[in-house]
Amino acid sequence: MGEKLAIVSPKVQTTRHRIKGILTEKNYQIIFSDTPGIIEPKYKLHEKMMQAVKSALEDADLALLIVDVKENWEECDAIFSALKLRVPAIVIINKIDLSDKIKTEAAIAYFTARPYCKKAVTLSALTGINKTKFINALLEFLPEGAPFFDGDDISDLNTRFFVSELIREKIYQLAQDEIPYHTAVIIREYQEKSTLVKIVADIVVHRETQKAILIGDKGSMIKRLGMLARKDIEDFIQHKVFLELFVKVKPKWRENELYLREYGY
């Protein structure tokens, strides 16, 4: 697609929504659904996330099961087997740029032998190694049909959503421990002016102590967070941005159905 549509972070459970990415070329259109990772729900937010996974699997023509070539394959196999997929699945063995040929070939052999795996494909999402082979493998299993989206579309979600995700990404990068998992970002204002785009956003946390940490000493943390987020937002929308951030406390918002609806879950 040529755009970053999801948060990039070494922390787990960063994706909370089902995000569709649309790849349109001359002879095909592929709609990718990025979903939250599969977890045992502990609160209502987790339940919403797992509903997004279930919905994506029910709608899909093909499941892409992504595994890091250096991960524990047996653990991945257990997770993939538990999905009880009703559609064909391709196992994507990622990060081959960090592996040797012997390890990569062993991974291919291991997953090809699994009953849910119709094909195993190697890829480096970072460097683009085997990108064409990856796309061709998908086309083998996808049905023919008319395009669902216009050729210029790259996602079914709006700009405000991606702006909120870019802000949330910076929280994952800068904040420690449980704080990223206790935050939500809500865009309160998105106004296009003649010379810039004005964006006002709330960062919602559970506790006053978390608010104090995100604001930082004399506002140092929120200033840095805003500066980094603004740069990425400007790169994304290709326009100068004025970004204003507020930190608000909403105790146990992850368990509150009304808050979850308001925040887009």
List the model feature ranges, each with a label.
Residues T159-Y265:
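P-loop NTP-binding site
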Residues G21-S33, E47-V121, L174, Q191-L196:
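Conserved C-terminal guanine-recognition region of P-loop GTPase G domains, centered on the G4
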Residues V87-I90, I96-F161:
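Canonical P-loop GTPase G-domain recognition
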Residues E3, I22-K26, I38, A56, ...:
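Conserved, well-folded catalytic cores of nucleic-acid-processing
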Residues V12-T14, P36-I39, V69-W73, I96-S99, ...:
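Conserved nucleotide-binding/hydrolysis micro-motifs of P-loop NTPases
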Residues M1-P10:
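A conserved segment at the C-terminal end of the G1
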